[in-house]
């Protein structure tokens, strides 16, 4: 009976479709073949454990890396409104010196896209943690920390899907 159970578990593991949600380190990711282009799309999401409260509501923040239709994106997704412009984002890796830059605001005002996603992902892959600071509309600076464990695997998957070297 033990062998039958082990065989069934092994078969179910090998038959798992690429397009199912999977986990690597602190990242949840999904890969699937785009039916329109036959290219592989990959999306990886890392949710920060840091939460802030605004107007009585808890606000969550996620870091998203993706290859979609051969385009690489890296962005901060916020359960809040950042404004309609280009948000100023501060990133601090592994307790090092914080670096400020201007990111591109996403449609709807609840996300901010890194100006050079490939460089940003390559930099993430060198570190264990990242603290990202941002100012939601009508609020003060919020800083959230991301445990980047598994980011090297995510970076490799995205680089392969979008045809760039890590």
Regions found by a protein language model. Give the residues of each.
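Sec-dependent N-terminal signal peptides
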Residues: 3-14
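A generic "folded-domain core" signal
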Residues: 17-166
